[in-house]
């Protein structure tokens, strides 16, 4: 076995920071799959990524020439030779197709018989020829939305590819990938005058990059260095940094030669700009780390840490430049706040008349009026809310969209409204709801923390869904430009997690009527929206690891209360030893299905001849008595426990009682007993999906 180190580095123009990690992981995983498919052995693979390079280093790669053996199977011996041992036509034709004489064929015995075979030995394609093909294939497989073409090529990738390095130890693999010839030099840091770094051996990577210009090619190493340096610098001003994984990932993806530097801003900004807006400006807009006081208050300090992409002797100038940019951003925020505060939040309401919500769905002012009516109609689902506060939150919900702050910082919609509402002495619950109406804004995001926030968020999303479905702007498998899937899932998460007993059918019908559409069939649109919600529910439970059978058994019942659905799914999933109940349900279903002639709906005691059927009726009555209140309270776990208690009398009934009695009335009476039990099951789920 000949072991060597292989290196491939794809040099590109600046890659998008938000997908850098995803790109290299896809590149790595697909390469591992290709090695496995081609049965190529190796010790391990290291992967590297910076804004301008993607690289893989394969350690102890087996490069020895191997021979692949293929067996071409011919006819069975009994068909290949006649009784006298002479070859048949089938054998001759097979040998001809293999381009051999029959005397070159071998025999192979298997469990199924004996066959003639031909062994074909082929040399495996050399690594030098195979790997360039694999690399180009994988790069084409990286399916991301925003790919581009460059120069005269029709090939597509996320960013133009400018350099390819392919080394097998010290040997350059001469080939092309995406029409770019391979070589043995890496591109320097973007700020370096010396363009090229020559690499002698694949094993030198990534040390050669760090030695030449402190480039840290390993993503995780770079991230840890940034985190360590930021914490170290914060201590110099008696501060700490809070963990912000999104910011850390973004900054790591933006630099390849990181250096953390400390800068400051005026303390006046802390006193005037609300804390969350200040943090948003520093972290989200400027991609810097905020510093907090190292005490229980965790107040923000007038400093920030930024990550430079270069080691420089001119750090003072770099710091000064970043301070000027930060001052400009914070100064803008202060100016916009001053301008916005000249009006009360509620005084922005009339200006919403000039802002369109969406074509054929009116203005934001009209949406506000719809929210007011809708939220009032669903206030009955919770008793802990002040109705006036609920309506007030709807009225003020969109007012901050007109402000200069939201115009400049659109990501802060809702948050700005909350601060202005608090400054205007609105109730705290109203202010928080204004902020929380947009939650959850992405998968796994936090949910509204207050009852008013929950209902406002649900109302806002239901209004959008109803309107978009009514005008035909529904999601497709490829596109969902209005985030309707996310909105529906957000509604379901709030309802289920916060245990709000909302009936989707009712609030969708109310929402559609509030719109007052002309030439719209509300019934059809409502059914489409419900179907859409059910598909999202199925996705929700599948993602959480619930059994597909259990999900289908409940969703097939055409229920429209997500909380009720959740209780049923959890009851069936949690109950131990439910298999015996499922078997009973199956047996009853099969018997009832094969007997269609049920005329009467009443059970007649006088027709009962056997003790077992009388006992079963008695147990059914006890069950009805015990579960009447449980069904009202939707305590399905307790109901299933009670159903399990029917198991023994049902078994006795099946063992001792002949259901298909010759007397029609007796037969019908016995079937009615089973139908009663069948209805108990159907009041929880369709158990036919479980067996």
Curated annotation (Swiss-Prot):
Family: Belongs to the class-II aminoacyl-tRNA synthetase family.
Catalytic activity, as annotated: tRNA(Gly) + glycine + ATP = glycyl-tRNA(Gly) + AMP + diphosphate
GO BP term (any one): glycyl-tRNA aminoacylation
Keyword flag Protein biosynthesis: yes
Protein name (record): Glycine--tRNA ligase beta subunit
Keyword line: Aminoacyl-tRNA synthetase, ATP-binding, Cytoplasm, Ligase, Nucleotide-binding, Protein biosynthesis
Main localization of the protein described in the UniProt heading: cytoplasm
Originating species: Buchnera aphidicola subsp. Schizaphis graminum (strain Sg)
E.C. number(s) listed in UniProt: 6.1.1.14
GO molecular function: arginine-tRNA ligase activity; ATP binding; glycine-tRNA ligase activity
């Amino acid at each position: 076995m000949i072991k060597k180190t292989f290196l491939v580095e794809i040099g590109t123009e600046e890659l998008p920071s938000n997908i850098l990690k995803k790109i290299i992981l896809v590149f790595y995983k697909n390469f591992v799959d290709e090695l496995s498919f081609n049965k190529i052995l190796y010790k391990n693979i290291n992967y590297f990524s910076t804004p301008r390079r993607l690289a893989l280093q394969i350690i102890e790669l087996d490069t020895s020439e191997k021979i692949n053996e293929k067996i071409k199977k011919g006819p069975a011996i009994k068909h290949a030779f006649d009784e006298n041992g002479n070859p048949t036509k089938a054998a001759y034709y097979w040998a001809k197709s293999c381009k051999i004489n029959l005397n070159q064929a071998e025999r192979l015995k298997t469990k199924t018989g004996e066959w003639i075979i031909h062994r074909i030995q082929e040399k495996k394609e050399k690594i030098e020829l195979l790997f360039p093909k694999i690399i180009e294939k994988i790069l084409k497989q990286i399916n991301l939305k925003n790919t581009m073409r460059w120069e005269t090529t029709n090939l597509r990738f996320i960013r133009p590819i400018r350099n390819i390095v392919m080394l097998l130890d010290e040997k350059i693999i001469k080939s092309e990938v995406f029409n770019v010839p391979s070589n043995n030099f890496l591109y320097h840091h973007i700020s370096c005058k010396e363009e090229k770094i020559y690499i002698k051996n694949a094993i030198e990577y990534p040390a050669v990059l760090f030695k030449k210009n402190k480039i840290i090619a390993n993503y995780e190493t770079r991230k840890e260095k940034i985190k360590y340096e930021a914490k170290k610098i914060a201590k110099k001003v008696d501060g700490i940094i809070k963990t912000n994984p999104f910011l850390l990932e973004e900054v790591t993806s933006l630099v390849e030669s990181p250096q953390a530097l400390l800068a400051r801003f005026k303390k006046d900004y802390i006193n005037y700009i609300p804390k969350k807006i200040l943090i948003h400006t520093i972290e989200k807009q400027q991609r810097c780390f905020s510093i907090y006081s190292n005490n229980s208050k965790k107040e923000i300090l007038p400093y920030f840490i930024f990550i430079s992409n270069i080691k420089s002797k001119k750090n003072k100038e770099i710091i000064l430049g970043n301070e000027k940019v930060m001052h400009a951003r914070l100064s803008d925020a202060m100016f916009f706040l001053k301008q916005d505060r000249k009006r009360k939040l509620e005084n922005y309401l009339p200006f919403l008349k000039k802002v369109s919500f969406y074509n054929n769905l009116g203005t934001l002012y009209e949406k506000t009026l719809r929210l007011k009516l809708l939220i009032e109609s669903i206030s009955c689902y919770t008793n802990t809310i002040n109705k006036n506060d609920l309506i007030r939150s709807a009225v003020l919900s969109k007012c901050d969209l007109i402000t200069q702050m939201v115009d400049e910082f659109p990501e802060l919609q809702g948050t700005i409204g909350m601060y202005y509402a608090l400054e205007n002495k609105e109730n705290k619950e109203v202010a928080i709801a204004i902020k929380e109406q947009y939650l959850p804004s992405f998968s796994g995001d936090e949910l509204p923390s207050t009852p008013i926030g929950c209902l406002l968020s649900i109302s806002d999303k239901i209004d959008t869904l109803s309107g978009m479905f009514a005008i035909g702007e529904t999601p497709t498998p490829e596109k969902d430009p209005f985030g309707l899937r996310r909105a529906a899932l957000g509604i379901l998460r709030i309802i289920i997690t916060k245990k709000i007993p909302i009936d989707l059918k009712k609030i969708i019908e109310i929402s559609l009527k509030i719109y007052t559409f002309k030439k719209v069939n509300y019934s059809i649109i409502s059914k489409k929206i419900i179907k859409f919600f059910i598909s999202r529910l199925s996705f929700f439970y599948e993602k959480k690891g619930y059994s597909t059978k259990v999900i289908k058994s409940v969703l097939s019942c055409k229920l429209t209360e997500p909380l009720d659905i959740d209780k049923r799914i959890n009851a069936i999933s949690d109950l131990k030893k439910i298999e015996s109940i499922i078997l009973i349900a199956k047996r009853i279903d099969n018997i009832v299905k094969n007997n269609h002639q049920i005329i009467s709906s009443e059970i007649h005691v006088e027709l009962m001849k056997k003790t077992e059927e009388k006992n079963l009726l008695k147990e059914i009555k006890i069950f009805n008595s015990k579960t009447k209140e449980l069904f009202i309270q939707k305590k399905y776990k307790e109901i299933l426990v009670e159903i399990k208690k029917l198991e023994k009398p049902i078994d006795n009934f099946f063992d001792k009682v002949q259901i298909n009695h010759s007397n029609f009335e007796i037969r019908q009476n016995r079937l009615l007993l089973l139908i009663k039990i069948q209805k108990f099951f159907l009041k929880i789920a369709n158990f036919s999906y479980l067996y």
